[in-house]
């Protein structure tokens, strides 16, 4: 029970992010309702509506930053001569109102104590959920590689690390049940998994992050390049089966795309998975033995989870 001056409010319901307080008086026609709207990505917004005999006399909006400090951003009174004085007395009693709202915040904090760890970019997912496709893939088994020039079908390819890179052309996907790629080693020693957000490119460093956009429907996804290919005419990138599902071209097989190399996100990603940029494979393996015997910094987040985190950062879908 919460008391504000001579007004008593009782908590009636607590579900679907709404807290409703009703005034406990002899006159049941007089209601005071406080509704709560939660926006976890920005702030908590509280709206207080005061009703007198089914007439809306006062409307006040409270906004709370994550620091839980109250900021009254709007106080609007609808003029009604008969109830103006009574309305003003209640609305101006900010200390009482703030006390009520602080109790609401306390309820929210209690409800959040037992929830699993949530992501900064999207409260919908947990690390465990994002790691469901590779829950044991907590250490990166591949090595960093740019590689030397190589020749395939009479054509020479020159791998390099660009500062800026975009390319437009056709994408295909691999990892179907009949093509035999699932579970095979990639060009940098990683293990290909058709359910992860990965791709193959002819010249980009391995691994690196690229943004792939389907020109037909403008759907985008950020992928980790960990293999070489494709080597068919007019194909610029091969994506995993999961990526093809997200980009919505699995059934048609190929689609026109635009790819963009993300150097800054790649640097951050390499640090998160504890992978040092070196062309020396032996050194990379030694480095792996000393560091990768321990799980990554967040022992609940797999390699694919880290890729999904980058997607969520840019508000991109991580599921079809």
UniProtKB/Swiss-Prot annotation:
Q: Which GO terms describe its biological process?
A: cell wall organization; peptidoglycan metabolic process
Q: Name one GO molecular function term.
A: lytic endotransglycosylase activity
Q: Which InterPro entries match?
A: RlpA, RlpA-like_DPBB, RlpA-like_sf, RPE5, RplA
Report the EC number(s), separated by commas if there are several.
Answer: 4.2.2.-
Entry superkingdom: Bacteria
Report keywords, A-Z: Cell wall biogenesis/degradation, Lyase
Which principal EC class is assigned to this enzyme? lyase
Q: What does this protein do?
A: Lytic transglycosylase with a strong preference for naked glycan strands that lack stem peptides.
Q: Which family does it belong to?
A: Belongs to the RlpA family.
List, alphabetically, the HAMAP family matched: RlpA (MF_02071)
Q: Which NCBIfam families match?
A: rlpA, RPE5
Q: Which PANTHER family match?
A: ENDOLYTIC PEPTIDOGLYCAN TRANSGLYCOSYLASE RLPA (PTHR34183:SF1)
Protein name (database record)? Endolytic peptidoglycan transglycosylase RlpA
> Which organism is the protein's source?
Rickettsia typhi (strain ATCC VR-144 / Wilmington)
């Amino acid at each position: 029970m919460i008391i504000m001056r001579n007004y008593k409010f009782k908590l009636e319901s607590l579900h679907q992010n709404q807290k409703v307080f009703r005034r406990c008086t002899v006159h049941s026609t007089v209601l005071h309702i406080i509704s709560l709207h939660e926006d976890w990505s920005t702030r908590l917004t509280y709206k207080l509506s005061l009703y007198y005999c089914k007439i809306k006399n006062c409307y006040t909006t409270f906004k709370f930053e994550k620091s839980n400090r109250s900021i009254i951003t709007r106080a609007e009174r609808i003029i009604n001569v008969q109830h103006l004085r009574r309305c003003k007395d209640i609305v101006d009693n900010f200390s009482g109102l703030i006390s009520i709202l602080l109790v609401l915040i306390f309820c929210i904090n209690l409800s959040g104590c037992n929830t699993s760890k949530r992501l900064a970019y999207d409260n919908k997912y947990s690390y465990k959920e994002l790691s469901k496709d590779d829950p044991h893939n907590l250490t990166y088994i591949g090595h960093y590689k740019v590689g030397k020039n190589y020749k395939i079908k009479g054509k020479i390819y020159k791998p390099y690390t660009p500062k800026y890179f975009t390319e437009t052309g056709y994408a295909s996907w691999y990892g179907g049940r009949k093509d035999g790629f699932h579970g095979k080693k990639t060009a940098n020693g990683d293990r290909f998994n058709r359910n992860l957000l990965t791709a193959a490119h002819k010249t980009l460093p391995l691994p690196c992050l690229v943004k792939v956009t389907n020109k037909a429907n403008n759907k985008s996804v950020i992928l980790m390049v960990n293999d070489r290919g494709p080597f068919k005419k007019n194909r610029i990138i091969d994506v995993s089966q999961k990526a093809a599902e997200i980009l919505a071209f699995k059934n048609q097989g190929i689609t026109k795309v635009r790819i963009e190399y993300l150097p800054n996100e790649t640097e951050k990603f390499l640090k998160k998975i504890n992978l040092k940029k070196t062309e020396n494979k032996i050194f990379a393996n030694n480095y792996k033995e000393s560091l990768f015997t321990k799980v990554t910094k967040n022992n609940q987040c797999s390699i694919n989870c880290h890729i999904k985190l980058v997607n969520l950062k840019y508000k991109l879908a991580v599921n079809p």
